[in-house]
Structures are given as structure tokens and as C-alpha cells.
Design a protein with these regions (language model features):
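Gly/Ala-rich beta-loop-alpha elbow adjacent to hydrolase catalytic centers
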Residues: 113-121
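Catalytic histidine neighborhood in serine/cysteine hydrolases
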Residues: 182-197
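Acidic catalytic loop of the alpha/beta-hydrolase fold
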Residues: 143, 167-172, 196-197
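Catalytic histidine-centered segment of alpha/beta-hydrolase-like enzymes
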Residues: 194-206
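Serine-hydrolase catalytic machinery in alpha/beta-hydrolase-like enzymes
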Residues: 16-26, 30-104
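Short beta-strand immediately N-terminal to the catalytic nucleophile in serine-hydrolase-like folds
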Residues: 110-113, 137
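Active-site nucleophile loop of the alpha/beta-hydrolase fold
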Residues: 39-40, 136-144, 166
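Short beta-strand/loop motif that positions the catalytic acidic residue
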Residues: 156-158, 162-165, 169
Length: 214
């Protein structure tokens, strides 16, 4: 595995430069790639949270390239956090960055987000058919509206959606989660004994995502 610290700009008029880490598998020519979106910065979310680090390690071992990055205003990324108002543009910048690289298969780009990152990632994904696959980990059904953008006339649903949530998730509403899964035609996995923060379940979740995308 190779690791490269990278920088790119958010997909917006402002010059917001984002920091990221691109991890590449060894011996794979133009691998598919996954954009990893971190939880809310108010709760300490960044590209360095253990779950995203583990997901990157496992996905790379399965032949994927992985781009972790910090949303605007987090770490060395410029700008200020907007609570979700503009972070979708950050995912767009990550997508464009990967699309322009010659060593990555731009026809097979996926998104995986945890908590706040799941909300941002899905909002970006339904804006167009740019990604065929998305994984939503612990989508916070309480406090975040996952449905208003699905009802938009120009919404395009990803062809392959995986949802992973803990049975004891403090920010979950099971009825809403099941409705979201149904609307997206998703494969829903509920982990017994796991809460929203998924401590101790990092590798299990990473393997679920990697196996689903095999």
C-alpha cells in the first residue's frame, strides 16, 4: 500500500483547499476508488477517526484506492464548517480530484460516509449519476433529514446502496431507517450490540463494506 498526502479544491467558486490522504493498493492498475466522508467536526470528526482509517486499510487490501479528506474548516483544510450547508461541495471536489487522476478508474468511484458524512455523501450522490455505489454507516436519522433531497425532481438514486447501523444507535429511528432503506433499494445491515459510535466494530464494518463491493 502507498500513502500520499494530497490537496484539492472544493467544487465551488470560493478557493477552499482541502487536505486529504490517498491510499493506493499495490500491484493494481487503475483501481476503483472510494471517497470516505468523516463525522461532524463538532463531535471531533476528521479523516483520522479510527473507523475511516480502518475502512481505508481494509478496502485497500481488497484492491480499492481510498481518499480520506477533511471537510472545510477541519484540520488543515481552509474555510469554515457550515454544518452541512456547503460540505457537499467538498465531496464534489474530492470526486473531481479522483476523476482527473490517470492511475484511478474514474468509471468506478464510490462514496462511504459515517454519521454526518453519510448525510453529506448521500446528498452529493443523488445530485447526479456520478457514483454507482454508496455506503451509509450509522446514518443519523434523528436530527438530519434524509428524505427532502430524495424527493427532488432531479434526484438520481445510486444503483448500489449499503446501510450499516448499530441496533443501539442513539441517533437512529428504526422506522425512518427502514423507510430510507426501502426508498434507496438498499442492503440494510443492523449490528447487534453496536451504538452510533461503533467502538470495537471498526473492522467488522470495513469488511462488510468491502465484501458488499466485491
Amino acid at each position: 500500500m502507498s500513502l500520499e498526502r494530497v490537496g484539492f479544491y472544493a467544487d465551488c467558486v470560493e478557493q477552499i483547499r482541502l487536505e486529504g490522504i490517498l491510499e493506493m493498493p499495490e500491484g493494481v492498475q487503475r483501481p476503483p476508488a472510494c471517497i470516505l466522508c468523516h463525522p461532524h467536526p463538532i463531535g471531533g470528526g476528521s479523516m483520522y477517526v479510527p473507523l475511516l482509517e480502518t475502512m481505508a486499510q481494509v478496502l485497500v487490501s481488497h484492491g480499492w484506492a481510498c481518499l480520506r479528506f477533511n471537510f472545510r474548516g477541519v484540520g488543515l483544510s481552509s474555510g469554515v464548517p457550515t454544518g452541512g450547508l456547503c460540505e457537499v461541495e467538498d465531496v464534489g471536489g474530492a470526486y473531481r480530484f479522483l476523476l482527473e487522476r490517470q492511475d484511478i478508474d474514474g468509471e468506478d468511484l464510490a462514496v462511504a460516509g459515517w454519521s454526518f458524512g453519510a448525510w453529506i455523501g448521500l446528498r452529493w450522490a443523488v445530485k447526479g449519476s456520478q457514483t454507482r455505489r454508496i455506503a451509509l454507516v450509522s446514518p443519523p436519522m434523528v436530527g438530519f433529514d434524509f428524505f427532502y433531497f430524495l424527493d427532488s425532481s432531479d434526484a438520481v438514486l445510486p444503483g448500489d446502496t449499503l446501510i450499516v447501523s448499530g441496533a443501539r444507535d442513539q441517533f437512529n429511528d428504526l422506522a425512518k431507517l427502514q423507510e430510507l432503506s426501502s426508498r434507496l433499494g438498499a442492503d440494510l445491515r443492523v449490528l447487534e450490540g453496536a451504538d452510533h459510535f461503533l467502538f470495537g466494530h471498526e473492522r467488522e464494518i470495513a469488511e462488510i463494506v468491502a465484501s458488499h463491493w466485491q
